[in-house]
Amino acid sequence: DAEQHGEVALKDANAKLQDLKAALQQAKEDLARLLKEYQELMNVKLALDIEIATYRTLLEGEECRMSGECQSSVSIEMVHNTTSSSSGGSGALGGGAGGRGGLGSGGLGSGSLGSGRLGSGGRGSRASRGNLALDSSSGGGSAVRGSVSNSGGSCAVSGVGGRGSVRVTQSSSQSQRSHHKL
C-alpha cells in the first residue's frame, strides 16, 4: 500500500515538473517576444530623439541667424545599428517647410533610413541645403552621409556595432553689428 502511495506521489511530482517545464518554456518565449518588441520600440525612440534634436538644433540656429546676432555652425552625428530588417521604406530624416518627410514606413526604427532631404523650413525661410545619401554597411547597420547648410554645418551617420547613439552639437559665434537710426 505504501509502495502504491509512493508511485502516485512520484507520478504527481513528475506531472508537476512537466507542467513547470512547459510554463518555463512559455515564459522564455514570451520574454524573447517582449525583448524583440522592446528593441523595436527603442529603435523608434532613437529615431524620434534624433529627429527632435535635429529640429531643435536647426530651429535654434535659424532663430539666431534670423536675429542677426550670430552665425551658427551645426554638427549632427548619429551612430545606429539595428538587427531588424525592413522590406523597404520611404521615410526621411527631417523634411522641408511643406511638412514632407518624417519617419515613413520602414524608417530608421525599422532598420533603414529613408532617402530624403534634411531641411529647416518654417517661418517663411528657405529650407536648408543638404542631401542625405543612404549607404549600406555590413552587420545590418545603415549609414547616411551628407551635410546641412544652416550658415554651415554637417550631418554624418555611420553604421557601427553596438547600441545607437546621437550627438548634436552647435557652436555659435557672435557677430558685432551696429544699427544706427538716421
Curated annotation (Swiss-Prot):
Residues 163-182 are annotated as: E2 subdomain. Residues 104-124 have a biased composition (Gly residues). Keywords: Coiled coil, Intermediate filament, Keratin. Residues 1-66 form the IF rod domain. It holds the Pfam family Filament. Residues 104-182 are annotated as: Disordered. Residues 144-158, 165-176 have a biased composition (Low complexity). Residues 87-162 are annotated as: V2 subdomain. It comes from the Eukaryota. Residues 67-182 are annotated as: Tail. Coiled coil: none annotated. The record marks 4 as: Stutter. Residues 1-66 are annotated as: Coil 2B. The keyword Coiled coil applies. Residues 67-86 are annotated as: H2 subdomain. The keyword Coiled coil applies. One of its GO terms (cellular component) is intermediate filament. Signal peptide: none annotated. InterPro entries: IF_conserved, IF_rod_dom. Heterotetramer of two type I and two type II keratins. PANTHER family: GATA-TYPE DOMAIN-CONTAINING PROTEIN, IF ROD DOMAIN-CONTAINING PROTEIN. There are two types of cytoskeletal and microfibrillar keratin: I (acidic; 40-55 kDa) and II (neutral to basic; 56-70 kDa). Belongs to the intermediate filament family. This is Keratin, type II cytoskeletal 68 kDa, component IA.
